[in-house]
């Protein structure tokens, strides 16, 4: 009974924090005030301040986490509605995803080499632009550290969501197709949530890109390691 009450309180506080950050973002729509980022910082700060362990938070957090699956499945609806566009533009979509995936991996390697990062961490940073569950499996298969891969995936997601819109504006990419592919390829699920601001077509393209990156990344990860003799 006590754990049930704790779980309910944690769920309510988490949802309340997120809604408050959404309201803040609507009032001040700045790139670094995106609700996912500010809510994460707020929750981490609260856990540290009140000395609450990760396991303690996950008593309620696991129920919120369980909604991730249905949320991903729900992305099938905009895909269905935009299917004719996806079929029509399948070649540029696939080309954009391949370029985004390869650049994501190669940029990670360049960053790692520039800062002299250890070999294990280098392999962990490789799948940073792929959605977390798949990135963990790729990193483990390559000999990386899965826990560090999660950190790099989060960094890629947040940096893409914050800087992505600025680059899209700077490069004058106004096509929902291009915006969705860019956000989904670079920032996986977080990029897809950001694509909501660009419309239904952008969300569809972002979810397609995220899925294709996960599938193709399983093949290209080992290939990049082999090509660059890592």
UniProtKB/Swiss-Prot annotation:
GO terms for cellular component: plasma membrane. It is found in: Cell membrane. The chain crosses the membrane at residues 4-24, 30-50, 67-87, 91-111, 148-168, 210-230. Keywords: Cell membrane, Membrane, Transmembrane, Transmembrane helix. The keyword Phosphoprotein does not apply. It is a multi-pass membrane protein. Disulfide bonds: none annotated. PANTHER family: HOLIN-LIKE PROTEIN CIDB, PUTATIVE SEROTONIN TRANSPORTER. Belongs to the YohK (E.coli)/YwbG (IPA-22R) (B.subtilis) family. This is Uncharacterized protein YxaC. It comes from Bacillus subtilis (strain 168). The gene is yxaC.
């Amino acid at each position: 009974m006590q754990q049930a009450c704790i779980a309910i309180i944690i769920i309510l506080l988490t949802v309340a924090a997120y809604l408050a950050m959404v309201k803040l973002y609507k009032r001040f729509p700045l790139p670094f005030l995106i609700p996912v980022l500010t809510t994460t910082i707020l929750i981490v700060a609260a856990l540290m301040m009140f000395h609450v362990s990760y396991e303690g938070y996950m008593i309620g957090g696991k129920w919120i986490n369980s909604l991730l699956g249905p949320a991903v499945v729900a992305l099938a609806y905009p895909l269905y509605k935009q299917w004719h566009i996806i079929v029509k533009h399948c070649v540029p979509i696939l080309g954009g995803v391949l370029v985004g995936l390869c650049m994501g991996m190669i940029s990670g390697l360049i960053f790692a080499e520039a800062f002299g990062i250890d070999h294990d961490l280098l392999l962990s940073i490789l799948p940073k632009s792929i959605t977390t569950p798949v990135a963990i499996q790729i990193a483990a298969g390559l000999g990386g550290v899965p826990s560090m891969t999660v950190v790099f995936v989060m960094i890629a997601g947040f940096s893409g969501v914050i800087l992505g819109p600025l680059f899209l504006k700077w490069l004058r990419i106004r096509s929902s197709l291009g915006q969705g592919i860019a956000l989904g390829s670079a920032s996986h699920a977080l990029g897809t949530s950001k694509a909501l601001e660009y419309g239904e077509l952008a969300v569809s393209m972002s979810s397609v890109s995220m899925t294709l990156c996960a599938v193709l990344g399983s093949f290209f990860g080992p290939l990049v390691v082999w090509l660059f003799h890592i």
